A protein has these predicted regions:
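Conserved nucleotide-binding/hydrolysis micro-motifs of P-loop NTPases
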Residues: 60-61, 84-88, 103, 112-117, ...
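P-loop/Walker A NTP-binding module and the surrounding RecA-like catalytic core of P-loop NTPases
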Residues: 6-22, 62-68, 86-89, 94-97
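Residue-level signature of catalytic and energy-coupling elements of molecular machines
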Residues: 13, 19, 38, 56, ...
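Conserved catalytic-core segments of large NTP-driven translation/proteostasis enzymes
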Residues: 123, 131-278
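C-terminal effector modules of nucleic-acid-centric enzymes and ribosome-associated factors
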Residues: 8, 105, 116-121, 131, ...
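Residue-level recognition of beta-strand microenvironments
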Residues: 11, 183, 200, 222, ...
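Conserved Switch II/interswitch segment of TRAFAC-class P-loop GTPases
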Residues: 57-62, 72-94, 99-123
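Conserved G1/Walker A P-loop phosphate-binding module
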Residues: 1-57
Length: 620
């Protein structure tokens, strides 16, 4: 069976620590102050058997933060209620916290039964317990115990072990996560962190991210149940010896994770439910305490379009944190007021990011609590910047396999490059591209195509998504590739009026000059036109394959280029080599044009350069 962690719960002085000692033989009050005061202040740990750990939490209201840190990583609870006291304030608050954290199973131990008045009193206490736990857990077993007489101890231990076998640990995300609840240093070893593995597994020698802080650390050693082990897995309690990180950089609330899977955050979107017992409403921008995993972080609550929330209500909210922490979608947390500290509710992390360009209030309010439906909403929110399967896995803090399951369930689409999209996203992207090209063709009627970079900037589609959509549109005959750019298939350049006349004159001139190319500036000067208009006409002629650009700003008619090729053929039929001087002689060109023309011939494969000599090229 997978390792199971049980957490205690209950009012101060109801005998939680004594009961743990009776079950395990371990006194979990290790601090001198705890032993002196006779009360649990911080978390204590004991082993019920090789597969079950018990975390003993403090019962005093002043140490609720420690209690929440302890139970945030447990799989089931052991609620302790003293027979002589019955239900007390911290009994109720601890139960409320267990409910908010969605702890599925609970065993109740009625302690100190030797102090009860009689059996009838015990029956009343048990009745109160069943009433207060009704609706929180699927079922509750109540065992009457006494550490003084030994009554019920063996029965309680057997029940805990039986229940542990049935614990559902299907929350595994597929990658390693450990929420740190203790940090200390050992001479000769360095920094040691302890916590419960809440996802994945970890091997000795691995590298982990220490968050927040984004520190890389090496796993020097691992212990579980006091023994050196090579690895730990989901559910295990572990002490992890780290190298590469100082003790003061890690604290309760830190998290160890597989590198690259989690990020430090300072805000997240969540679905919260306020406790029905809450006496005051929760106000917009109110300062609260967020107990997330083993961390406690102060935050401001941003209600979406509301000024306040009443007790018992639910809502999607944004939480702006005052310091960085770690969270993943699906993580549960507890909300407490800043001062005085009382538990007011809890919630579930929906997402740790908000898409750019959305109306935050309406977007947050509409987010679905169900992770599958929420994934579809998120995919639709990134209509111009669709993500790949791996990117979605990172954003949702899960595996590629989980994302693929969602894709199949929702009947979403993927490209060959694993980009996830819907038919709606594809249709919208196509419309954006068509509209962008239409506007370009209207603004630049003499341009045969729009540069891909410009199309990406104007459409605001991500580069990889634009490539995919354009490829689909080309297959469908909507767009075409022209001159290393993109155009609508139906678009054709039409020269009219003065532009048509300018084109005719320029073409005639480029034909008449023979092997001498002309520059853009020369043509502009000759026809008293600006360079921009001349270039537009030249690109039209180039698209019609009437002229070619030999080099930047140097143009030649294709008929004359063909004549140049014949001139080279004739030269090499009589000579094996050619120097620059030879080329100048056979073309009557100055060095200004001879060099770029020779380089053009090299690119065409008509000539092959070796030092200052050129020989016949493979394409001549």
């Amino acid at each position: 069976m997978a390792h199971v962690v049980i957490g205690t719960a209950g009012h101060i002085d109801h005998g939680k620590t004594a009961l743990v000692k009776a079950l395990t033989g371990t006194d979990t009050d290790q601090l001198a102050e705890e032993q002196a005061r006779g009360m649990t202040i911080d978390l204590g740990f004991a082993f019920l058997n090789d597969n079950v750990t018990i975390i003993d939490v403090p019962g005093h209201e002043k140490f609720i933060r420690n209690m929440v840190a302890g139970v945030s990583t447990i799989h089931m609870a052991m609620l302790v209620v003293a027979a002589d006291d019955g239900i007390m304030p911290q009994t109720r608050e601890h139960l409320q916290i267990l409910k908010l954290l969605n702890i599925p199973q609970c065993v109740v131990a009625v302690s100190k039964t030797d102090l009860a008045e009689d059996e009838e009193w015990l029956d009343l206490v048990e009745l109160d317990i069943r009433e207060i736990t009704d609706g929180i857990f699927k079922s509750v077993d109540v065992i009457r115990t006494s550490v003084n007489t030994g009554v019920g101890i063996a029965e309680l231990k057997n029940l805990l072990e039986q229940k542990a076998v049935t614990v559902d640990q299907s929350t595994n995300r597929g990658f390693f996560r450990l929420q740190v609840d203790r940090v200390f240093s050992m001479a000769g070893f360095g920094t040691v962190t302890t916590g419960t593995v809440i996802s994945g597994d970890l091997k000795k020698g691995s590298t982990v991210d220490v968050l927040p802080g984004n520190i890389k650390a090496k796993v020097r050693g691992i212990q579980s149940h006091g023994l050196d082990v090579q690895s730990v897995q989901l559910g295990d309690r572990a002490a992890v010896n780290l190298s590469g990180v100082d003790k003061d950089k890690v604290f309760r609330g830190s998290e160890l994770a597989l590198p690259g899977k989690l990020k430090s955050i300072k805000k997240f979107t969540a679905h919260i439910k306020l406790a029905s017992e809450m006496k005051k409403e929760l106000k917009h921008h109110q300062r609260v305490r967020v107990h997330l995993g083993t961390a406690e972080v102060l935050a401001r609550v941003h209600l979406s379009g509301k000024k306040k929330l009443l007790s018992g209500s639910t809502a999607n909210v944004n939480l702006d944190l005052e310091k960085s922490t770690v969270a993943a979608s699906g993580d549960r947390f507890v909300l407490r007021t800043y001062s005085p500290m009382t538990t007011i509710g809890g919630g579930t992390v929906l997402t740790t990011f908000i898409p750019k360009g959305v109306k935050v209030n309406s977007w947050v309010s509409a987010l679905d609590v169900d992770p599958v439906q929420r994934f579809e909403q998120l995919v639709d929110s990134f209509s111009t910047q669709p993500y790949t399967i791996s990117e979605w896995a990172l954003l949702n803090q899960c595996t590629d396999e989980k994302v693929n399951k969602w894709i199949t369930k929702l009947d979403l689409q993927t490209t060959k490059k694993d980009i996830v999209f819907t038919h709606k996203i594809l249709d919208e992207s196509k419309k954006i591209i068509v509209s962008t090209l239409n506007i370009f063709h209207q603004r630049k009627p003499l341009r045969r195509s729009m540069g891909v970079d410009i199309l990406q900037q104007e459409s605001r589609l991500s580069t990889i998504w634009l490539e995919e959509v354009v490829a689909m549109m080309k297959k469908e005959g909507i767009v075409k590739f022209v001159e290393s750019g993109i155009a609508l298939t139906a678009y054709k350049v039409k020269l009219v009026g003065g532009t048509a006349e300018l084109s005719r004159k320029m073409e005639n001139n480029l034909t008449k000059v023979g092997l001498k190319p002309l520059t853009t500036a020369e043509l502009s000067q000759k026809y008293n036109e600006n360079d921009k208009r001349v270039l537009e006409v030249l690109h039209v002629l180039k698209g019609d394959k009437k002229v070619s650009e030999i080099e930047n700003g140097i143009w030649m008619h294709t008929e004359n280029i063909a004549k140049l090729r014949q001139t080279l053929i004739k030269h090499f039929s009589q000579n094996n080599e050619m120097e620059v001087t030879d080329f100048k002689n056979i073309t009557a060109l100055t060095r200004k044009f001879a060099i770029p023309m020779l380089e053009y011939c090299d690119k065409q494969g008509w000539t092959c350069r070796s030092g200052n000599q050129r020989s016949k090229g493979a394409n001549l």
